[in-house]
Amino acid sequence: LMGKLTLSSEIERLKAIPDFQGTNWSSIKPEFAARMAIQNQFKTGIDVAKYTASIMRKDMEAYDSDTASYTQSLGCWHGFIGQQKLISIKKHFGTTDKKYLYLSGWMVAALRSEFGPLPDQSMHEKTSVASLVEELYTFLRQADARELAGLFRELDKAPQDQQQSIQDKIDNFETHIVPIIADIDAGFGNEEATYLMAKQMIEAGACCIQIENQVSDEKQCGHQDGKVTVPHSDFLAKINAVRYAFLELGVDDGVIVARTDSLGAGLTKQIAVTNEAGDIGDQYNSFLDVEEVTAETMNHGDVLINQNGKLVRPKRLPSNLYQFKKGTGEARCILDSITSLQNGADLIWIETERPHIGQIGAMMDE
């Protein structure tokens, strides 16, 4: 349902305004102003984000109690498409409950870039996602206004004995505003850039932001090969940046989805900083493809690390990227997921080369 605002209470509130007591506003009808207010209960994107965040948290709690109580998210790339989807859902199911919209980075790259259709490599404009979030909620608010306008017309035409039932429909109207899961890719830069972009997306109405652990300027579509990940400290800094954006804007229960692309990523941009054996940097580096070396077998320009008391040389490509050991993707996904959930993420996403429930289930069991 929408907010607690009811038509009758809003009419009474407006009538109490001093200017309605005299003749200055004699041509203004409180009833009409109240209807307009009911049609526009979400004044800003922050209002939308707060409202939808509470819905998403409630749905997450319901799913934790009963996995049959799941949500469904539909992808969309234009406000009109999103609007028509929600109108159809509400008409068919009688409710928009547990129905979300999903705003994918690849859709934005392919269909919303000023450069024209692009591959999913974060080459589109940084502001494209936030613009689409704002557009979607503009169209969804219009869907509310349209349906409520129909109810207002019914109320005007209805005989006295039928007006209360129509009034109840208005007061219990279910909005088309639903949560949007918005893809921020890898943050489009460092943590400062991530914070600024997340803030813009939240101001547009996003209550949920999905972020991935790829290198921002090397980012690939989740289904493509050649992906490059970053150490956990870099990724967690961006998760923190998104959380700070939520908190600054007053969306205290905003949702962060941490996506790991490690299953299809055989490369890392850098060796993680580690201060002691077993810390998160050391765990990340333990997956590197290395060979033990001595002073005699070292080459000019080699990068060497001390790993478990041994001097080793990580395999470095001509691109200056470092290679992980083969077959470590699932183990890295598990470490990524646990680390993200322990450090501020609310949900996790494990990117696979194709939908594979068994594969995901095995990693969750592990």
How would you label these PLM feature ranges?
Residues G3-E366:
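Alpha/beta enzyme core
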